[in-house]
UniProtKB/Swiss-Prot annotation:
Residues 1-63 are annotated as: Disordered. It is found in: Nucleus; Chromosome. The keyword Repressor does not apply. Belongs to the protamine P1 family. GO terms for biological process: chromosome condensation; sperm DNA condensation. Disulfide bonds: none annotated. One of its GO terms (molecular function) is DNA binding. This is Sperm protamine P1. Protamines substitute for histones in the chromatin of sperm during the haploid phase of spermatogenesis. They compact sperm DNA into a highly condensed, stable and inactive complex.
Amino acid sequence: MARYRRHSRSRSRSRYRRRRRRRSRHHNRRRTYRRSRRHSIRRRGRRRGYSRRRYSRRGRRRY
């Protein structure tokens, strides 16, 4: 029993370390993706000629 407990403890420790690093990386990646997507949408809207009021309304509702 003691041996199993010891093993699980070390395993969880390594897992936590890995998880933490992976999580931060994923979060950063997600943020950049969202940002880039938003910018592209804005550019597209300006090019097409969407009304400013409509765009602002959409953005407000989204956030």
